[in-house]
């Protein structure tokens, strides 16, 4: 009889195992009173953030700018993707009914003008957690009516009705990551499919044609340049307008190993490829889905304003 695979061991929060990095991936981490305030605000509410749970290398940078990405529906995922550090369980705890208000109170305390939510996959819930996310967004609209809201959602196992529930909540940006090129998807996220992700992105574009739709990929997993270019084309063809591209850094030795470190020049090249397809691309070694999300939205709006002024 085959033994069930052991659940992965999670590295201590805030610690990433040591791995020799190229020069362009070494950074000086800022700290100060703003970082301390952000940290204290989040700890006071007991909220989970993807910044901590996923061991994001940008946590110090973002918290020093008084920004954070809230992790909704708890801190335990019903999937176990090979790149991700978030805890796994087939039966996560029920969602906290007080979480929507806690997130709103935290966002108010941090005076967030652009609020970013992400979520653990909740395949154990009938709608994948879509209605619960919608509750959070409605609460945020009530408490911070002037703030924009960005949501990085799961694929809801292809449930379009669940997607519509989320989209009807009034978000500013809908984000769903394909994460990697099609060939590597079964290894990187075995409970998802590349085509299903494209389908959900396209369904969002069809349902709300004016909605800003975003997706992202990691590089350094062994993908070929031609595969990245094809992925960018696929995203453009399925209604995506914003794409993030960043270097994959494994959280521990238990995760998928890095195959290669992509140079800044290659990120610039991928950006130019995406822009030639009509995409707004934010690419760089430390770029993540929610990294500088407020600046990305602002720059996109500026670019759209410039285009609108061009005589036709």
UniProtKB/Swiss-Prot annotation:
<dbReference type="GO" id="GO:0005737">
    <property type="term" value="C:cytoplasm"/>
</dbReference>
<feature type="binding site">
    <location>
        <position position="62"/>
    </location>
    <ligand>
        <name>[4Fe-4S] cluster 1</name>
    </ligand>
</feature>
<protein>
    <recommendedName>
        <fullName>Lipoyl synthase</fullName>
        <ecNumber>2.8.1.8</ecNumber>
    </recommendedName>
</protein>
<dbReference type="GO" id="GO:0051539">
    <property type="term" value="F:4 iron, 4 sulfur cluster binding"/>
</dbReference>
<dbReference type="Pfam" id="PF04055">
    <property type="entry name" value="Radical_SAM"/>
</dbReference>
<keyword id="KW-0963">Cytoplasm</keyword>
<dbReference type="InterPro" id="IPR013785">
    <property type="entry name" value="Aldolase_TIM"/>
</dbReference>
<keyword id="KW-0949">S-adenosyl-L-methionine</keyword>
<dbReference type="InterPro" id="IPR031691">
    <property type="entry name" value="LIAS_N"/>
</dbReference>
<feature type="binding site">
    <location>
        <position position="81"/>
    </location>
    <ligand>
        <name>[4Fe-4S] cluster 2</name>
    </ligand>
</feature>
<dbReference type="GO" id="GO:0016992">
    <property type="term" value="F:lipoate synthase activity"/>
</dbReference>
<dbReference type="InterPro" id="IPR006638">
    <property type="entry name" value="Elp3/MiaA/NifB-like_rSAM"/>
</dbReference>
<keyword id="KW-0408">Iron</keyword>
<feature type="domain" description="Radical SAM core">
    <location>
        <begin position="63"/>
        <end position="280"/>
    </location>
</feature>
<dbReference type="InterPro" id="IPR003698">
    <property type="entry name" value="Lipoyl_synth"/>
</dbReference>
<feature type="region of interest" description="Disordered">
    <location>
        <begin position="1"/>
        <end position="20"/>
    </location>
</feature>
<feature type="compositionally biased region" description="Basic and acidic residues">
    <location>
        <begin position="1"/>
        <end position="10"/>
    </location>
</feature>
<comment type="similarity">
    <text>Belongs to the radical SAM superfamily. Lipoyl synthase family.</text>
</comment>
<feature type="binding site">
    <location>
        <position position="77"/>
    </location>
    <ligand>
        <name>[4Fe-4S] cluster 2</name>
    </ligand>
</feature>
<keyword id="KW-0004">4Fe-4S</keyword>
<keyword id="KW-0411">Iron-sulfur</keyword>
<feature type="binding site">
    <location>
        <position position="84"/>
    </location>
    <ligand>
        <name>[4Fe-4S] cluster 2</name>
    </ligand>
</feature>
<dbReference type="InterPro" id="IPR007197">
    <property type="entry name" value="rSAM"/>
</dbReference>
<keyword id="KW-0479">Metal-binding</keyword>
<comment type="pathway">
    <text>Protein modification; protein lipoylation via endogenous pathway; protein N(6)-(lipoyl)lysine from octanoyl-[acyl-carrier-protein]: step 2/2.</text>
</comment>
<feature type="binding site">
    <location>
        <position position="56"/>
    </location>
    <ligand>
        <name>[4Fe-4S] cluster 1</name>
    </ligand>
</feature>
<dbReference type="Pfam" id="PF16881">
    <property type="entry name" value="LIAS_N"/>
</dbReference>
<feature type="binding site">
    <location>
        <position position="51"/>
    </location>
    <ligand>
        <name>[4Fe-4S] cluster 1</name>
    </ligand>
</feature>
<keyword id="KW-0808">Transferase</keyword>
<feature type="binding site">
    <location>
        <position position="290"/>
    </location>
    <ligand>
        <name>[4Fe-4S] cluster 1</name>
    </ligand>
</feature>
<dbReference type="GO" id="GO:0046872">
    <property type="term" value="F:metal ion binding"/>
</dbReference>
């Amino acid at each position: 009889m085959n033994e069930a695979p052991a659940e992965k061991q999670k590295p201590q929060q805030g610690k990433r195992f040591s791995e020799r990095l190229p020069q362009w991936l070494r950074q000086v981490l800022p700290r100060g009173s703003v970082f301390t305030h952000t940290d204290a605000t989040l700890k006071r509410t007991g909220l989970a953030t993807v910044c901590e749970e996923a061991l994001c290398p940008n946590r110090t940078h973002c918290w020093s700018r008084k920004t954070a990405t809230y992790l909704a529906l708890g801190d335990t995922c019903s999937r176990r993707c090979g790149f991700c550090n978030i805890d796994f369980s087939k039966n996560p705890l029920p969602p906290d009914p007080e979480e929507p208000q806690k997130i709103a109170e935290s966002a108010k305390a941090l005076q967030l003008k652009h609020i970013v939510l992400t979520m653990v996959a909740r395949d154990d819930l009938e709608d994948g957690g879509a209605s619960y996310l919608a509750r959070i967004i409605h609460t945020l609209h009530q408490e911070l009516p002037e703030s924009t809201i960005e949501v990085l959602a799961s694929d809801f196992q292809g449930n379009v009705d669940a997607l519509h529930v989320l989209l009807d909540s009034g978000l500013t940006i809908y984000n769903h990551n394909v994460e990697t090129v099609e060939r590597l998807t079964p290894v990187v996220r075995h409970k998802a499919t590349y085509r299903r992700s494209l389908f959900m992105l396209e369904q969002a574009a069809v349902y709300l044609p004016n909605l800003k739709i975003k997706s992202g990929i990691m590089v350094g997993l062994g993908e070929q340049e031609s595969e990245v270019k094809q992925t960018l084309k696929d995203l453009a063809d399925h209604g995506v307008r914003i794409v993030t591209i960043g270097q994959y850094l494994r959280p521990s030795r238990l995760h998928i190993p890095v195959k290669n470190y992509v140079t800044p020049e290659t990120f610039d090249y991928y950006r130019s490829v995406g822009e030639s397809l009509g995409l707004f691309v934010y690419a760089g070694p430390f770029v993540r889905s929610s990294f500088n999300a407020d600046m990305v939205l602002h720059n996109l709006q500026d670019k759209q304003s410039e285009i609108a002024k061009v005589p036709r």
